[in-house]
Design a protein with these regions (language model features):
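An acidic-aromatic pocket/loop used at catalytic or ligand-binding sites
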Residues: 58-87, 180-207
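N-terminal/domain-start segments enriched in small and hydrophobic, helix-friendly residues
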Residues: 2-15, 50, 55, 92, ...
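Short, structured protein-protein interaction patches enriched in aromatics and acidic/basic residues
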Residues: 11-19, 34-58, 62, 151-181
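C-terminal structured domains
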Residues: 158-224
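Extended intrinsically disordered, low-complexity coil regions enriched in Ser, Thr, Gly, Ala
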Residues: 15-38, 132-154
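Surface-exposed interaction/gating patches
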Residues: 2-9, 99-150
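Surface-exposed beta-loop interaction hotspot
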Residues: 63-126
């Protein structure tokens, strides 16, 4: 009965549920549009699946022994995702890779990207490669600058979006795909967490209402 504020998360440990109860809960919650895979630096992993109730997340995390622990969370995004999104490198110009043949706007875009990463007051900021004259060399230059992060996000809806964290703090590589037309949009998003991943407050309110209806239906018992 509470809508958590942005970056606040409500959590419930599912370790006390028996196998039947856990199966029932998973069936009830289903699978929503967002799935996340996080690979920690120490080798541990987290797997996150949004439920059909937007903003309700099923989270599986490995503990220090490598065992999987499951819990349920409610919020705009799960706690593990907020935490992992900050464990990256703050850049300086020394990170710029050497220029390569075929560069058009790659160096200018790289300097723009680094400037916004260094100044959180200018975030969020988007560099939409789809709407800019960029070459394959530009894309490779930006990819080498940003490196690979430890978070992979997939969303499904009208199409599929692939959102990958880079090795730079608050820099995300976003690609929106269409099964027939291929790549629709490619961008670098500079922000703590892309809005595309987060459940909006109105989505959380809608989920609360729907869960209230489900709880009422369960409490009423089977029909006579």
């Amino acid at each position: 009965q509470k809508i958590p504020a942005k970056q606040d998360v409500l959590g419930w440990d599912l370790s006390t549920l028996n196998a039947d109860d856990l199966t029932f809960l998973n069936t009830l919650l289903g699978e929503g549009e967002v799935s996340v895979r996080i690979q920690q630096a120490d080798g541990r992993a987290s797997e996150i699946q949004e439920s059909i109730f937007c903003g309700i997340w099923r989270v599986r995390c490995q503990n220090d022994l490598g065992q999987w622990e499951e819990h349920l969370e409610a919020g705009s995004a799960p706690r593990a995702l907020w935490q992992a999104a900050t464990i990256t490198t703050l850049p300086d110009d020394s990170l710029l890779p050497p220029p390569v043949d075929g560069l058009m706007n790659g160096l200018t875009l790289a300097q723009e990207l680094l400037a916004h990463v260094r100044d959180p007051a200018t975030q969020p900021h988007s560099i939409n490669l789809t709407q800019l004259p960029v070459s394959d060399a530009d894309r490779q230059f930006l990819s080498r600058l940003c490196g690979e992060g430890r978070i992979q996000i997939r969303t499904i809806g009208y199409g599929e979006s692939q959102i990958d964290a880079t090795a730079l703090r608050h820099v995300w590589h976003v690609r929106c795909l269409d099964t027939l037309k291929g790549l629709l949009l490619e961008s670098y998003e500079i922000c703590p967490l892309p809005e595309l991943v987060q459940a909006a407050p109105e989505d959380l309110r809608d989920s609360l209402q729907r869960l209230d209806e489900v709880c009422g239906w369960l409490a009423s018992g089977p029909p006579a």
